[in-house]
Amino acid sequence: YDPLDKWLWNTPIPLPPTTPTAPAWQDTQHLLELGNLADPQLIPFWRETAVATLPHNSYHYEHLTIAAAALTLIAIRRQSEIAIHTLRHLTNNSRPDIRELAIHYLGRAYTEAGRPFPHTLLNDITLIAQHDTAFEPRYQARRILQIAGEPLPLDNPNGVYDFKVTPMHSRRTYRTIAIRSEQTLRDLQRFIQHAFEWDNDHLYSFYLNGRKYDGRYRFSSSYEENRPPWAYEAIIGQIGFPLGHHLLYHFDYTADHLFEIEVTAIRPQIRAGNYPRIIADHGKPPAQYA
């Protein structure tokens, strides 16, 4: 769901199914029309829409996304520093969902316009990447640093992460895998296949926020065309995983095998030996082929 792509490239937007005459649906359509105007006079309106859209409201995520994307479109088409400043201000909001989208679209305000990131902005983004308490804003900040060619923070250096991997169609079965901070999502993917005694013969993706098909958080197999970033590029300790975080592993898009992954421990020291390794298991591996 990306209104900025619709406005810039006329990409269709899939909206949640509902009755087209419902007030929330009509409000969403109206916001999309207003956003496409890229009117600098609407900057205060978009700022207020972002902060006033509450999580329990219908279409709250869509409305919040439209507000952040509309500010970005104004920054791109009108070269508005006020729109940029508004997005930067929203990156400090108390709500993580607002911070996440503000950081994501702030990055796009520069990349879509082909503008370099100012050093002052990169300094602020680095602080968010290191210290934000929520995963999504921290990860989005790290994506900006990566795009800008800046070094990424390495959390828990020389330590390990424990990932509990559970097939979503067989929740009584799991494998807990320990992997070093310096290893990659591709290392984790290969070992998941090994741990469940499955062939590794299909494409796959990780969705770091646990939402299937959310391209902002997707890392894919390197055999896929035009779908970077790749899993082999994603170093575990640079992603920004907090304890208790959940992500999604999608293997074999036709068979649609889904695995929930939970960060169950982040340990600063490792035992000698090879990693990844299984440290806990329960249940018989489910069949790969029906």
Language-model-derived ranges and their functions:
Residues 23-31, 38, 63-69:
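Extended HEAT/HEAT-like alpha-solenoid repeat tracts in very large eukaryotic scaffold/adaptor proteins
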